[in-house]
Protein backbone atom coordinates (compact mmCIF):
# COMPACT_ATOMS: atom_id res chain seq x y z
CA UNK A 1 0.00 0.00 0.00
CA UNK A 2 2.76 2.40 0.81
CA UNK A 3 4.50 2.05 -2.53
CA UNK A 4 1.28 2.68 -4.41
CA UNK A 5 0.58 5.87 -2.46
CA UNK A 6 4.04 7.20 -3.13
CA UNK A 7 3.65 6.42 -6.82
CA UNK A 8 0.32 8.22 -6.89
CA UNK A 9 1.85 11.25 -5.18
CA UNK A 10 4.67 11.35 -7.69
CA UNK A 11 2.28 11.00 -10.64
CA UNK A 12 -0.22 13.67 -9.20
CA UNK A 13 -0.14 17.10 -10.89
CA UNK A 14 -1.71 19.87 -8.75
CA UNK A 15 -2.11 22.19 -11.73
CA UNK A 16 -4.32 19.61 -13.56
CA UNK A 17 -6.55 19.09 -10.47
CA UNK A 18 -9.66 21.35 -10.68
CA UNK A 19 -10.41 21.08 -6.95
CA UNK A 20 -7.01 22.45 -5.90
CA UNK A 21 -7.29 26.32 -5.10
CA UNK A 22 -4.55 27.78 -2.86
CA UNK A 23 -5.81 31.45 -3.17
CA UNK A 24 -9.19 30.59 -1.74
CA UNK A 25 -7.47 28.78 1.12
CA UNK A 26 -5.42 31.93 1.98
CA UNK A 27 -8.53 34.15 1.83
CA UNK A 28 -10.37 31.73 4.08
CA UNK A 29 -7.50 31.89 6.56
CA UNK A 30 -7.53 35.71 6.58
CA UNK A 31 -11.29 35.82 7.04
CA UNK A 32 -11.05 33.50 10.00
CA UNK A 33 -8.44 35.77 11.60
CA UNK A 34 -10.64 38.90 11.10
CA UNK A 35 -13.61 37.04 12.56
CA UNK A 36 -11.58 36.27 15.64
CA UNK A 37 -10.63 39.98 15.99
CA UNK A 38 -14.27 41.05 15.67
CA UNK A 39 -15.28 38.58 18.30
CA UNK A 40 -12.64 39.98 20.69
CA UNK A 41 -13.78 43.60 20.03
CA UNK A 42 -17.38 42.60 20.62
CA UNK A 43 -16.43 41.01 23.90
CA UNK A 44 -14.62 44.24 24.95
CA UNK A 45 -17.67 46.34 24.03
CA UNK A 46 -19.94 44.03 25.95
CA UNK A 47 -17.65 44.39 28.99
CA UNK A 48 -17.65 48.23 28.67
CA UNK A 49 -21.44 48.49 28.49
CA UNK A 50 -22.05 47.16 32.03
CA UNK A 51 -19.44 49.61 33.36
CA UNK A 52 -21.26 52.57 31.73
CA UNK A 53 -24.54 51.32 33.10
CA UNK A 54 -23.05 51.10 36.58
CA UNK A 55 -21.76 54.70 36.35
CA UNK A 56 -25.15 55.96 35.17
CA UNK A 57 -26.85 54.10 38.02
CA UNK A 58 -24.43 55.67 40.55
CA UNK A 59 -25.07 59.18 39.18
CA UNK A 60 -28.83 58.64 39.34
CA UNK A 61 -28.51 57.45 42.94
CA UNK A 62 -26.52 60.60 43.83
CA UNK A 63 -29.09 62.86 42.16
CA UNK A 64 -32.01 61.11 43.83
CA UNK A 65 -31.67 63.32 46.95
CA UNK A 66 -32.15 66.60 45.02
CA UNK A 67 -35.18 68.19 43.54
CA UNK A 68 -34.54 67.71 39.82
CA UNK A 69 -37.10 70.36 38.93
CA UNK A 70 -35.14 73.14 40.69
CA UNK A 71 -32.02 75.12 39.89
CA UNK A 72 -29.83 73.29 42.41
CA UNK A 73 -29.98 70.00 40.48
CA UNK A 74 -29.12 71.74 37.20
CA UNK A 75 -26.18 73.57 38.78
CA UNK A 76 -24.94 70.34 40.39
CA UNK A 77 -25.03 68.46 37.09
CA UNK A 78 -23.19 71.28 35.34
CA UNK A 79 -20.46 71.25 37.98
CA UNK A 80 -20.07 67.47 37.61
CA UNK A 81 -19.71 67.79 33.85
CA UNK A 82 -17.08 70.49 34.18
CA UNK A 83 -15.19 68.42 36.73
CA UNK A 84 -15.24 65.38 34.42
CA UNK A 85 -13.95 67.36 31.45
CA UNK A 86 -11.15 68.90 33.54
CA UNK A 87 -10.03 65.54 34.91
CA UNK A 88 -10.15 64.01 31.45
CA UNK A 89 -8.06 66.81 29.93
CA UNK A 90 -5.55 66.62 32.78
CA UNK A 91 -5.23 62.84 32.33
CA UNK A 92 -4.73 63.25 28.59
CA UNK A 93 -2.05 65.89 29.16
CA UNK A 94 -0.23 63.70 31.67
CA UNK A 95 -0.37 60.55 29.55
CA UNK A 96 0.46 62.08 26.17
CA UNK A 97 3.40 64.28 25.30
CA UNK A 98 4.49 66.11 22.19
CA UNK A 99 3.56 64.37 18.96
CA UNK A 100 1.10 62.04 20.69
CA UNK A 101 3.81 60.06 22.51
CA UNK A 102 3.06 58.44 25.85
CA UNK A 103 4.96 59.97 28.80
CA UNK A 104 6.96 57.87 31.20
CA UNK A 105 6.83 58.09 34.97
CA UNK A 106 10.07 60.07 35.15
CA UNK A 107 8.74 62.68 32.68
CA UNK A 108 5.56 63.08 34.72
CA UNK A 109 7.56 63.55 37.94
CA UNK A 110 9.73 66.24 36.29
CA UNK A 111 6.63 68.12 35.09
CA UNK A 112 5.09 68.04 38.59
CA UNK A 113 8.26 69.54 40.05
CA UNK A 114 8.20 72.33 37.47
CA UNK A 115 4.59 73.15 38.31
CA UNK A 116 5.19 73.17 42.07
CA UNK A 117 8.21 75.54 41.92
CA UNK A 118 6.66 79.01 41.56
CA UNK A 119 9.53 81.00 43.11
CA UNK A 120 11.79 83.08 40.90
CA UNK A 121 15.04 81.39 40.05
CA UNK A 122 16.88 84.67 39.37
CA UNK A 123 18.64 86.83 41.98
CA UNK A 124 16.45 88.92 44.34
CA UNK A 125 17.26 92.65 43.99
CA UNK A 126 15.09 94.05 46.86
CA UNK A 127 15.79 93.57 50.55
CA UNK A 128 12.32 93.62 52.13
CA UNK A 129 13.58 93.85 55.71
CA UNK A 130 15.83 96.83 54.98
CA UNK A 131 13.03 98.60 53.11
CA UNK A 132 10.60 98.08 56.01
CA UNK A 133 13.16 99.36 58.54
CA UNK A 134 13.71 102.47 56.41
CA UNK A 135 9.99 103.16 56.23
CA UNK A 136 9.61 102.89 60.00
CA UNK A 137 12.65 105.06 60.79
CA UNK A 138 11.50 108.02 58.64
CA UNK A 139 9.53 110.73 60.55
CA UNK A 140 5.87 111.25 59.79
CA UNK A 141 5.32 114.34 57.63
CA UNK A 142 2.04 116.17 58.33
CA UNK A 143 -0.16 116.68 55.33
CA UNK A 144 -0.44 120.29 54.22
CA UNK A 145 -3.19 121.67 52.01
CA UNK A 146 -1.04 124.42 50.43
CA UNK A 147 1.74 123.39 48.05
CA UNK A 148 5.28 124.56 48.81
CA UNK A 149 6.90 126.79 46.15
CA UNK A 150 9.86 125.44 44.24
CA UNK A 151 13.08 127.03 45.51
CA UNK A 152 14.87 126.40 42.22
CA UNK A 153 12.39 128.64 40.42
CA UNK A 154 12.40 132.42 40.21
CA UNK A 155 12.76 133.97 43.72
CA UNK A 156 10.17 136.62 42.85
CA UNK A 157 7.60 133.93 42.12
CA UNK A 158 8.53 132.24 45.41
CA UNK A 159 7.87 135.47 47.31
CA UNK A 160 4.51 135.87 45.59
CA UNK A 161 3.57 132.30 46.44
CA UNK A 162 4.59 132.76 50.08
CA UNK A 163 2.61 135.97 50.41
CA UNK A 164 -0.47 134.37 48.84
CA UNK A 165 -0.19 131.41 51.23
CA UNK A 166 0.15 133.73 54.23
CA UNK A 167 -2.91 135.81 53.31
CA UNK A 168 -5.50 133.11 54.16
CA UNK A 169 -3.74 132.46 57.49
CA UNK A 170 -3.93 136.12 58.48
CA UNK A 171 -7.56 136.24 57.38
CA UNK A 172 -8.32 133.23 59.56
CA UNK A 173 -6.45 134.77 62.49
CA UNK A 174 -8.75 137.77 62.44
CA UNK A 175 -12.09 137.34 64.11
CA UNK A 176 -14.85 137.87 61.51
CA UNK A 177 -17.22 139.18 64.20
CA UNK A 178 -14.80 142.01 65.10
CA UNK A 179 -15.46 143.70 61.72
CA UNK A 180 -19.20 143.89 62.42
CA UNK A 181 -21.21 146.10 64.72
CA UNK A 182 -24.70 145.50 66.04
CA UNK A 183 -27.11 148.40 65.65
CA UNK A 184 -30.15 148.30 67.90
CA UNK A 185 -32.23 151.44 68.21
CA UNK A 186 -35.79 152.51 68.90
CA UNK A 187 -37.00 155.87 67.57
CA UNK A 188 -40.26 157.69 67.10
CA UNK A 189 -40.88 159.21 63.67
CA UNK A 190 -44.14 160.51 62.26
CA UNK A 191 -46.11 159.25 65.25
CA UNK A 192 -44.90 155.65 64.94
CA UNK A 193 -42.38 153.77 67.04
CA UNK A 194 -39.75 151.92 64.98
CA UNK A 195 -37.37 149.31 66.39
CA UNK A 196 -34.32 148.22 64.34
CA UNK A 197 -31.71 145.56 65.08
CA UNK A 198 -29.09 144.56 62.49
CA UNK A 199 -25.40 143.83 61.93
CA UNK A 200 -23.40 146.14 59.67
CA UNK A 201 -19.73 146.62 58.84
CA UNK A 202 -17.78 148.74 61.29
CA UNK A 203 -16.40 151.01 58.55
CA UNK A 204 -19.78 151.57 56.88
CA UNK A 205 -21.50 154.96 56.78
CA UNK A 206 -24.47 153.71 58.81
CA UNK A 207 -22.20 152.41 61.59
CA UNK A 208 -20.31 155.71 61.74
CA UNK A 209 -23.55 157.65 61.95
CA UNK A 210 -24.83 155.35 64.71
CA UNK A 211 -21.65 155.72 66.78
CA UNK A 212 -21.73 159.49 66.29
CA UNK A 213 -25.34 159.59 67.51
CA UNK A 214 -24.37 157.80 70.74
CA UNK A 215 -21.99 160.62 71.65
CA UNK A 216 -18.34 160.88 72.66
CA UNK A 217 -18.70 158.54 75.67
CA UNK A 218 -20.11 155.76 73.50
CA UNK A 219 -18.34 152.39 73.88
CA UNK A 220 -16.25 151.02 71.03
CA UNK A 221 -18.51 148.03 70.58
CA UNK A 222 -21.98 148.94 69.34
CA UNK A 223 -23.47 145.73 70.73
CA UNK A 224 -22.53 146.80 74.28
CA UNK A 225 -24.23 150.15 73.74
CA UNK A 226 -27.37 148.45 72.48
CA UNK A 227 -27.39 146.19 75.51
CA UNK A 228 -27.05 149.24 77.80
CA UNK A 229 -30.04 150.85 76.11
CA UNK A 230 -32.23 147.77 76.47
CA UNK A 231 -31.03 146.87 79.99
CA UNK A 232 -33.84 148.84 81.60
CA UNK A 233 -36.46 146.94 79.61
CA UNK A 234 -35.12 143.54 80.73
CA UNK A 235 -36.52 142.03 83.91
CA UNK A 236 -35.74 138.87 85.74
CA UNK A 237 -38.37 136.16 85.32
CA UNK A 238 -40.67 135.54 88.25
CA UNK A 239 -42.96 132.73 89.20
CA UNK A 240 -46.37 132.90 87.64
CA UNK A 241 -48.10 130.84 90.32
CA UNK A 242 -47.52 130.39 94.02
CA UNK A 243 -46.89 126.90 95.38
CA UNK A 244 -49.17 125.52 98.12
CA UNK A 245 -46.10 124.82 100.24
CA UNK A 246 -44.96 128.44 100.24
CA UNK A 247 -46.00 130.65 103.17
CA UNK A 248 -48.61 133.30 102.47
CA UNK A 249 -47.00 136.72 102.51
CA UNK A 250 -47.91 140.15 101.25
CA UNK A 251 -45.38 139.86 98.44
CA UNK A 252 -46.93 136.64 97.20
CA UNK A 253 -50.47 137.91 97.57
CA UNK A 254 -49.75 141.09 95.59
CA UNK A 255 -51.17 141.34 92.10
CA UNK A 256 -48.79 140.45 89.31
CA UNK A 257 -48.72 143.27 86.78
CA UNK A 258 -46.66 141.26 84.30
CA UNK A 259 -49.44 138.66 84.04
CA UNK A 260 -52.00 141.23 82.92
CA UNK A 261 -52.34 140.51 79.18
CA UNK A 262 -55.39 142.64 78.47
CA UNK A 263 -55.58 145.20 75.67
CA UNK A 264 -55.27 148.09 78.13
CA UNK A 265 -52.01 146.77 79.50
CA UNK A 266 -50.65 146.32 75.98
CA UNK A 267 -51.51 149.90 75.11
CA UNK A 268 -49.87 151.13 78.29
CA UNK A 269 -46.70 149.18 77.49
CA UNK A 270 -46.67 150.62 73.97
CA UNK A 271 -47.07 154.15 75.31
CA UNK A 272 -44.25 153.60 77.78
CA UNK A 273 -42.01 152.38 74.96
CA UNK A 274 -43.01 155.34 72.82
CA UNK A 275 -42.17 157.77 75.58
CA UNK A 276 -38.73 156.23 75.99
CA UNK A 277 -38.06 156.19 72.23
CA UNK A 278 -36.09 159.08 70.78
CA UNK A 279 -38.12 161.39 68.60
CA UNK A 280 -36.49 162.06 65.23
CA UNK A 281 -37.11 165.01 62.95
CA UNK A 282 -37.01 164.95 59.16
CA UNK A 283 -33.34 165.92 58.90
CA UNK A 284 -32.16 163.15 61.22
CA UNK A 285 -34.32 160.57 59.46
CA UNK A 286 -32.93 161.73 56.10
CA UNK A 287 -29.38 161.24 57.40
CA UNK A 288 -30.20 157.67 58.42
CA UNK A 289 -31.80 156.88 55.06
CA UNK A 290 -28.89 158.45 53.17
CA UNK A 291 -26.34 156.37 55.11
CA UNK A 292 -28.30 153.19 54.30
CA UNK A 293 -28.46 154.16 50.60
CA UNK A 294 -24.71 154.91 50.46
CA UNK A 295 -23.87 151.48 51.89
CA UNK A 296 -26.35 149.75 49.61
CA UNK A 297 -25.08 151.36 46.38
CA UNK A 298 -21.39 151.32 47.40
CA UNK A 299 -20.83 155.06 47.08
CA UNK A 300 -18.70 155.47 50.18
CA UNK A 301 -15.28 155.57 48.45
CA UNK A 302 -16.57 157.75 45.65
CA UNK A 303 -18.03 160.26 48.10
CA UNK A 304 -14.80 160.37 50.10
CA UNK A 305 -12.78 161.14 46.96
CA UNK A 306 -15.27 163.77 45.89
CA UNK A 307 -15.18 165.35 49.34
CA UNK A 308 -11.39 165.70 49.21
CA UNK A 309 -11.36 167.34 45.76
CA UNK A 310 -11.43 171.12 45.28
CA UNK A 311 -14.65 171.06 43.26
CA UNK A 312 -16.71 169.60 46.08
CA UNK A 313 -19.57 171.47 47.71
CA UNK A 314 -17.81 171.55 51.08
CA UNK A 315 -14.68 173.00 49.51
CA UNK A 316 -16.73 175.70 47.83
CA UNK A 317 -18.48 176.52 51.07
CA UNK A 318 -15.12 176.83 52.82
CA UNK A 319 -13.87 179.12 50.04
CA UNK A 320 -16.91 181.36 50.31
CA UNK A 321 -16.57 181.49 54.11
CA UNK A 322 -12.91 182.48 53.89
CA UNK A 323 -13.74 185.17 51.32
CA UNK A 324 -16.46 186.59 53.55
CA UNK A 325 -14.10 186.69 56.53
CA UNK A 326 -11.51 188.50 54.45
CA UNK A 327 -14.03 191.10 53.34
CA UNK A 328 -15.14 191.71 56.90
CA UNK A 329 -11.50 192.06 58.00
CA UNK A 330 -10.79 194.60 55.25
CA UNK A 331 -13.93 196.57 56.12
CA UNK A 332 -13.00 196.67 59.80
CA UNK A 333 -9.50 197.92 58.97
CA UNK A 334 -10.94 200.62 56.74
CA UNK A 335 -13.27 201.83 59.48
CA UNK A 336 -10.42 201.90 62.00
CA UNK A 337 -8.24 203.90 59.59
CA UNK A 338 -10.99 206.41 58.96
CA UNK A 339 -11.63 206.80 62.69
CA UNK A 340 -7.93 207.52 63.28
CA UNK A 341 -7.88 210.28 60.73
CA UNK A 342 -10.75 212.06 62.33
Swiss-Prot record:
Record keyword Repressor present: no
Cellular compartments per GO CC: Swr1 complex
Primary localization: nucleus
Intrachain S-S bonds: none
Domain of life: Eukaryota
Start and end residues of each BCNT-C domain: 260-341
Region (Disordered): 1-126, 142-178, 214-238
Ranges annotated as biased composition (Basic residues): 78-87
Compartment list: Nucleus
GO biological process, one term: chromatin remodeling
PROSITE patterns named among the record's database cross-references: BCNT_C
Keyword Transcription regulation assigned: yes
Alphabetized UniProt keyword annotations: Activator, Chromatin regulator, Nucleus, Transcription, Transcription regulation
Acidic residues bias (residue ranges): 8-20, 33-43
Described purpose of this protein according to its UniProt entry: Component of the SWR1 complex which mediates the ATP-dependent exchange of histone H2A for the H2A variant H2A.Z leading to transcriptional regulation of selected genes by chromatin remodeling. Involved in chromosome stability.
Similarity annotation: Belongs to the SWC5 family.
Subunit composition and interactions: Component of the SWR1 chromatin remodeling complex.
Protein name, as recorded: SWR1-complex protein 5
Organism: Neurospora crassa (strain ATCC 24698 / 74-OR23-1A / CBS 708.71 / DSM 1257 / FGSC 987)
Amino acid sequence: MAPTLELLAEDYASEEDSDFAPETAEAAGESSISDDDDEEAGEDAEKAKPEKRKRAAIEEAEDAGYDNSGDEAIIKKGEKRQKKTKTKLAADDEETGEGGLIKTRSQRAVEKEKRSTAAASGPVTIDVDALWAQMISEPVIPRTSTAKPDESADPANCDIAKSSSQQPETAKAKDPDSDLIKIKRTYNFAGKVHTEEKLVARDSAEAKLYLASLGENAPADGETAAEDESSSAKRMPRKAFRSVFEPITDANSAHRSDLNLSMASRLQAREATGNKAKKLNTVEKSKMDWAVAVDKMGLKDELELAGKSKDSFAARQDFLARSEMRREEEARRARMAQAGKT
